[in-house]
């Protein structure tokens, strides 16, 4: 077996691998000997079938396996000897693949881009500022007020009062399309909060200003993308009778409200809110700190990037942003989305930082534990209530999904490792300052 280098330019590598006919035949023979003890054939006892007969019957089938084993072995030996780590799966092409005949040498061309040498960084030269926000009384009171509004009740307005935006109207209604009532279009004593957006666009607005005992014909058009296809885009009329008009009344800030949210009393609820707010502030502060760290790391290192990785990342960015700008397009049945220079620049940054963090983690032997993976899978599974078991099985069968869950955990552990050696000072700020810092992340 012979491996000949045909290209070595920057990170680009190309080789010709030659497996001689004799080596290939020896591989086939090896597989036949390995299989012989388990093969039965008419006229022979199990394991006693002559190799010549086995080769005649099973040789063509084993030839492909032997060829693949030989090529894989040559590639593996080459990578171990050279120390190269391909950035992506090597491209392998069999020369004369369509015209190759048994008894001749197998010649394969292999191409790949090697991962670059990643320079060491001195974490002690990294200097960062961590924003610290305390949960003050005003923030706690604001959160309490929001909880009270979420737990609000509705009380009847004075007789003859007109419904306002935010009020609850209790209505009977019958919906029709082309003069015919349609299934699911009627209800009695239905409580509808005006302005909630829970009904078809334009419906709730036509009930603002109504009073008890008013009879109103609401005219609307079903959205073109409405779930019930037989109604999508159709004009409809709803005959409505207003039976009650109620004003919202926020719940009292007392122990009863606290018990609704699982706390023993109001003081305990305030304590829970304080802890939750500080956890939120801490998470937001970490996001700002991590971005600042990545910005510094990006300025500290410079090395050649595998062009194929950058190209793949740029296309992924362009594709993702296109779908964010076209949320109505759920599939991938669209033309090629060409990355812009901005996409390519962002891709280069992501690839550079990704390779740097991966190398730091590799050298420090950072790993993601089974317990950490289980927690990540559990967190994702909660998004599919009632289908948790199916999601677990889906993850178990998909290494790519496992890697998608593992990658951010690994990255955060490497970030923590770097922060341990960096100089990090704390700066106490208000929540508005933290919010501005978070908003600035989205603009970058």
Swiss-Prot record:
One of its GO terms (cellular component) is cytoplasm. It holds the Pfam family Trigger_N. Involved in protein export. Acts as a chaperone by maintaining the newly synthesized protein in an open conformation. Functions as a peptidyl-prolyl cis-trans isomerase. Residues 166-251 form the PPIase FKBP-type domain. It comes from the Bacteria. InterPro entries: PPIase_dom_sf, PPIase_FKBP_dom, Trig_fac, Trigger_fac_C, Trigger_fac_C_sf, Trigger_fac_ribosome-bd_bac, Trigger_fac_ribosome-bd_sf, Trigger_fact/SurA_dom_sf. This is Trigger factor. SUPFAM superfamilies: FKBP-like, Triger factor/SurA peptide-binding domain-like, Trigger factor ribosome-binding domain. GO terms for molecular function: peptidyl-prolyl cis-trans isomerase activity. Its EC number is 5.2.1.8. It is found in: Cytoplasm. PROSITE patterns: FKBP_PPIASE (PS50059). Its main location: cytoplasm. It catalyses: [protein]-peptidylproline (omega=180) = [protein]-peptidylproline (omega=0). Belongs to the FKBP-type PPIase family. Tig subfamily. Consists of 3 domains; the N-terminus binds the ribosome, the middle domain has PPIase activity, while the C-terminus has intrinsic chaperone activity on its own. It is an enzyme of class 5 (isomerase). Disulfide bonds: none annotated.
């Amino acid at each position: 077996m012979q491996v000949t280098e045909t290209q070595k330019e920057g990170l680009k590598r190309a080789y010709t691998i030659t497996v001689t006919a004799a080596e290939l035949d020896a591989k086939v023979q090896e597989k036949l000997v390995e299989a012989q003890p388990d093969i039965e054939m008419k006229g022979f006892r199990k394991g006693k079938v002559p190799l010549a007969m086995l080769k005649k019957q099973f040789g063509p089938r084993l030839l492909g396996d032997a060829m693949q084993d030989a090529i894989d072995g040559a590639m593996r030996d080459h990578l171990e000897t050279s120390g190269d780590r391909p950035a992506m799966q090597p491209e392998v092409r069999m020369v004369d693949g369509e015209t190759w005949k048994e008894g001749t040498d197998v010649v394969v061309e292999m191409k790949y881009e090697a991962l670059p040498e990643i320079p060491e960084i001195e974490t002690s030269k990294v200097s960062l500022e961590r924003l610290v926000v305390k949960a003050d009384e005003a923030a706690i009171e604001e959160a309490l007020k929001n909880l009270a509004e979420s737990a609000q009740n509705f009380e009847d307005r004075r007789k003859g009062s007109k419904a306002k935006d935010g009020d609850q109207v209790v209505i009977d209604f019958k919906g029709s399309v082309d003069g015919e009532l349609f299934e699911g279009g009627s209800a009695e004593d239905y409580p509808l909060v005006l302005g909630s957006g829970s009904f078809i666009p334009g419906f709730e607005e036509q009930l603002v200003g109504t009073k008890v005992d008013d009879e109103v014909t609401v005219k609307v058009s079903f959205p073109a993308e409405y779930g019930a296809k037989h109604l999508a885009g159709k004009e409809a009329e709803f005959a409505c009778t207003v039976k009650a008009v109620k004003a919202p009344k926020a719940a009292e800030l007392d122990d009863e409200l606290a018990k609704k949210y699982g706390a023993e009393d109001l003081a305990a609820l305030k304590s829970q809110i304080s802890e939750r707010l500080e956890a939120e502030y801490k998470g937001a502060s970490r996001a700002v700190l991590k971005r600042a760290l990545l910005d510094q790391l990006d300025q500290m290192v410079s090395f050649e990037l595998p062009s194929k990785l950058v190209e793949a990342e740029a296309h992924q960015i362009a594709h993702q942003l296109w779908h964010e700008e076209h949320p109505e397009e759920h599939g991938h049945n669209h033309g090629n989305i060409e990355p812009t220079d901005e996409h390519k620049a962002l891709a280069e940054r992501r690839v550079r930082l990704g390779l740097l963090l991966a190398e730091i983690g590799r050298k420090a032997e950072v790993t993601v534990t089974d317990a950490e993976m289980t927690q990540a899978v559990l967190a994702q599974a909660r998004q599919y209530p009632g289908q948790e078991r199916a999601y677990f099985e889906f993850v178990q069968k998909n290494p790519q999904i496992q890697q998608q869950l593992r990658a951010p955990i690994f990255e955060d552990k490497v970030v923590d490792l770097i922060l341990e050696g960096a100089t990090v000072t704390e700066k106490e700020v208000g929540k508005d300052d933290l919010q501005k810092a978070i908003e600035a992340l989205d603009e970058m």
